Regions:
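Catalytic-site signature of metal-activated, phosphate-bearing donor transferases
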Residues: 2-166, 174, 181
Length: 181
């Protein structure tokens, strides 16, 4: 946690956590050696400090799990320092896994892939994060982050289309290669 967030948490604790059932704060992500301070990456406000008697975790454990509380939530100053990816390959693999899980979730809810979702939604995700929210101010890091996030939307839509057309999303298991025996 940043020094500012540490001080805000201590102040809330010293007040007995009396003003809210939970506290959210900005998550500042390190993206391959640079903290992203613009675009869709920041401020990524998350609820992480809460009274367990008044809340808990909801959602699927693998994706989009979130804290939820009964009562008011306050935003604390400062940043939660976040190191989400060790490498670009890890991010791409995680993005693909999340895209598949979300496509399966949306398919189960009856959502459908459309050409506009395939073409326009990724473009909008990129332009919103990179231009409108200032991701370009993070340089190459911001460009790559915006591109990978847009590609997630594209992957999810393609996987949703595959599911609605009864096509496999993953490759079937391969038979062992016996040529080397």
């Amino acid at each position: 946690v940043s020094d500012a967030l540490r001080a805000a948490i201590i102040a809330a604790r010293d007040a007995g956590f009396a003003t809210a059932a939970g506290y959210r704060f900005a998550r500042l992500s390190d993206y391959f050696g640079r903290f992203l301070r613009h675009g869709n990456a920041y401020p990524d406000r998350v609820l992480r400090l809460f009274d367990r008697r008044r809340g808990g975790w909801r959602g699927k454990r693998e994706i989009h799990e979130a804290a939820s509380v009964d009562g008011p939530v306050e935003t604390l100053a400062g940043d939660l320092i976040h190191y989400p990816y060790r490498s670009l390959m890890q991010q791409l693999a995680k993005t693909q896994r999340y895209a598949q899980m979300m496509a399966e979730h949306e398919h189960a809810r009856g959502k459908r892939a459309t050409w506009s979702k395939l073409v326009l939604a990724p473009a909008w995700r990129f332009w919103r994060g990179y231009l409108l929210r200032g991701g370009f101010r993070d340089g190459w890091h911001g460009l790559i982050y915006a591109y990978v996030r847009a590609n997630y939307v594209r992957q999810k839509t393609i996987m949703l289309w595959l599911l609605q057309n009864n096509q496999p999303v993953q490759d079937p298991p391969r038979a062992p290669d016996r040529r080397s025996e």
